[in-house]
Amino acid sequence: LAGGSSNTGGAVRNRFFSVPELNELSQRINPETASPLQYYPLLKPGERFPINDPDLQPCLDPRPEDRVEFLHGLLESLSRIEAQGYCLLQQFGATPLTQVLTAGGGAKNEAWRSIRERYLKVPVRSSCQEQAAYGTAQLALQGTWPKSSSDCIRNLDVNRQ
């Protein structure tokens, strides 16, 4: 949901960290330890989901001097917002999560994957496709051919192995 339904996500993360820095700092995060930082990381005011508020202000304070602590707080906050989104979807009648298949740059970040699992309480695995638009493509497929799309998607993910 981060970067898709929500205005939080990779773009916010990439504003503060280069890919090499992100990779190096992520290895120094203990994903089993919760960060005390409570951010709502937005690039500009306004959120769509899970909070529908066009005036919601970004919250990226306090900002620790230690870049590892800052990244840890950012990844924790993105994961918390993602969990809030899935919880809200379930309140509206969506099927409860059993696993999350993830794509895009964040799928390669082991620390973030572990943090997401802690918040979502389900396995988070990399999808067979690495492109960030993969989830959107799956939704489009289901909207176009709803009866055959589940088998197609399942086969794509199984063939990855």
Show the residue positions of the predicted features.
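Active-site core segments that coordinate phosphate-bearing ligands/cofactors
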Residues: 1-100, 108-160
